[in-house]
């Protein structure tokens, strides 16, 4: 349908668009990793007794049907598979639903599957309760929340018997813990991805982020929210998406097309997009994504420097979950803030409502001279490169811009008079934005690498570091290693080796002079390097063996 709509245009732009979309292959993983579900067909129906007992016989093709009534009426005769509980909790996915409740004859909560069918779990859940026993914005595979919408039952009666067997789906993400800024050495940091998943697939044990591939629905908001690319979308990966965008625009122009506008949309909106393209100008090029939120500011701005005059984001507010809407809105607000700070119109990147098809007017001019090659590097590097190009040709050139509180851009400030250069901040920094000078006591900072995770602020024992959310438009200042603090080194009083910041040695001497282990000449060891300190301890033991008991 989409192809025929594109080919219906006979003008130059229309022909160029059809050639670009039909003739550009998106390189992706043709055999992606998969996740496998196993279902024996054990169904649990939850809801009011009157409703669930009326349905039981309609699922006779399934392996088993268990009924769980949530009202307090008396049991109907003839239903040995009927249980009662008003306190029900459930977790899991297709083939592995664990339902816990307190049923008659049990003093405590029990696994209902073990009680009812002798298994650890149910395979499917049909939920007819008003509020649902699982509260995820995007239901887990195998969980069907009907509530009071009885019109859905007929289709489920037909569909559920087919949910027995083995089912595969793609594994939509890649997770690299080495890049994650969530925690380090017991200090908690970035948590942007945790509240970005509407499917409940992400969790944290306080040390690492985990993604349950069985709950993941491929929405991509976690990857968009992740500032370090510890989480990346895999179908396709962001670089392939951007390369595809670049090739489409390049092919469009090679075929004679002019003034391209990109319209990103999720696959489920293909019908609405096809209808819209029949009316929109033929210079509007539609780019399909698995989900709209799988790409963010780096892809949007890359499209502008590839030659797109405008980037439109097709959204359907009738079904978009609140979490996706929030992540997308935050990302869009940041993009539009960058644009307006440079004097560009905010709607060069904007949401597109299908009801505006008739009144849409495209931009006639590009913002910059398009780049000839697709951008490479991390998503931050591609974003910064795009912004630098736009900044160069901007009418307004700000030095710094404020950003939202949790935006992954900014600096750190340090109250240097109380800094001891203990390097606790360096030890936890996940991106090496903060790092030591190396050959002498000192602390350096690279603003472009800072994702504002906050671990340095929490790890500092002297509480002298604080975050400064902002965007620095001076690309040289943003990239260079800036000196935060430096001081003379303390030299070992025994061998002369520089071994620690002088202020730290002074501070430790003052704090430990009353300690039992540092009485008399022992206090001198604080002013020694590690080798001389050990040597001095053993020399003292040799002279006074009884001193071993005091070390």
Range-by-range predicted roles:
Residues 1-195, 259-271, 275, 313, ...:
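Ferredoxin-type iron-sulfur electron-transfer modules and their immediate structural context
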Residues 1-22, 203, 207-241:
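Helix-enriched interaction subdomains in cytosolic or periplasmic regions
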